[in-house]
């Protein structure tokens, strides 16, 4: 019988002479959960997905129409390596409207999703002696990107007493002459928490490059998201269209960077990626110009789901110390039920047929927690939580 708790090393044996940094990378566990869930579905099992951070909405109609029109207009060739100038102007205008900051369109690199932006920044900033400060827990892939750039991840615990927020003093203590950058993410994955103005001002003053992942901006239900560019122009901003506009499959993101870095970033972009999809870029222009009402509609639906899920999880015995303010995740304390979030997540999948993400996927600081995604219909969320509740009852909780 297949052991779903295996490390998957047998499946992923590599050649003898491979990069040791790659061997240090951990699996993206949520993808392992999804892979097993898909296997169960192929066997006829009805699985409810509360694990994957992907909007369940279709792209806005204006986005689909723009993509189709781009094909009809034969806009299927390479664009400028930094991205279509019209799209970069729209991104700059968006940052002016949203945050009151002036962004030079020539300081924007359009990428195939925001993940290439992470790679571009780290390849620019890092060498084998570099250190990059990350939160623990934090987005699972940051650490592996740092390893891919031959650098060392330095993990700073989030403070449970402070609502799973970054502690600026803990960061300050980790800054050394080798620090190449500090990753911040707001709203945060997996916690959904916003970084406040005081923190952003403080971290911007440390004299270290800040890499600010702002991909969940636009999906904020309480408070206001601030861009790091409101406090410094020496930062690197990662953003994109996947979450806000539900455009995950179109793979469109962007990087905003200091002007002094642009030529180096352009060389990296030219050599590694050439350019982002011309079709997706046309769709991005339409999204920024016309999709605000679609985003507002999606946000209202997410918020309804968020409120329901928070209430229901608490009834079930999960502890939610601080309610998430944005994104579409709830990071719930499951230590009443388990000390092994990996095993717990797969047990829930196998027995309740609901996919959830183990907290250990986000670092050792996430152990004992599980992440629930409310990027699914309210009907599916209700059914999924019913199944988990029944499973926990069978286990004696």
Predicted features along the sequence, with ranges:
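Conserved N-terminal alpha-helix of the aminotransferase class I/II PLP-enzyme fold
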Residues: 78-111
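Intrinsically disordered, tyrosine-centered linear signaling motifs in cytosolic regions
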Residues: 77-78, 216
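PLP-dependent class I/II
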Residues: 4-14, 24, 28-46, 54-70, ...
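Extreme N-terminal starter segment of soluble prokaryotic enzymes
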Residues: 16-19
